[in-house]
Amino acid sequence: MTYSLKDLAAQLQTGSQGARALVEDCLAAIDDPNGEGQRSFIEVYHDRARNEADAVDHARKQGWSLPAFAGIPMSIKDLFDEAGIVTRAGSKILQNAAPASSDATVLARLKAAGFIVIGRTNMTEFAFSGLGTNAHYGDARCPFERDPNDITKGRVAGGSSSGSAVSISDGMAPATIGSDTGGSTRAPAAFCGIVGLKPT
């Protein structure tokens, strides 16, 4: 994605871009067998994202009032609760835990603003490392010095929000949310050559 969120929102509002087309672009990047999608995402919502995008496109054609960012896909770190989804925190230990009963506040607000969640991103297990490696779900690699013929070669993406950062750097989502206590958003952003923000 080479557009800002503001630009994408304007394109959607004017009809020069459709939500379904945006979602399909993201899914194609995620599903690319030569890309980092399989190591950057723990779960991808193919059908749900498409259905939500179609609903946004339909509503826009009807002239209905929509939130500012309606139809823009985003990824979320596997540390945030989402109603009906298991929050694994990048660990196999929690894969059979009970699904979350509600959305995390930040996620609820992003959905209310119109974002479409396209999937949950890989992360350092329990957010406990700055490298971004994960023995269970693979190591998402930063965009620099990758070897497309050998997934064991390449630089780490930084952690703990590794998959979130790579989802942006590789065009798998135009927006993401990570978390940051001691650099878990800022470090992967720096490693991947993008911008990460930790609000104070």
Language-model-derived ranges and their functions:
Residues V56-P73:
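Immediate post-signal peptide segment of exported/extracytoplasmic ligand-binding proteins
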Residues G15-S16, G63, K77:
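Short acidic-aromatic low-complexity motifs
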Residues A49, G71, K77, L110, ...:
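Conserved hydrophobic/aromatic pocket- or pore-lining residues that grip, position, or stack substrates
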Residues A68-V106:
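Enzymes and membrane/adaptor proteins characterized by extended Gly/Ser/Thr/Asp/Glu-rich
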Residues S102-T200:
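Short glycine/serine-rich loop segments
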Residues D47-D54, G114-F115, T124:
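Long amphipathic alpha-helix in the N-terminal Rossmann-like dinucleotide-binding domain
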Residues M1-N51:
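An N-terminal boundary/leader segment
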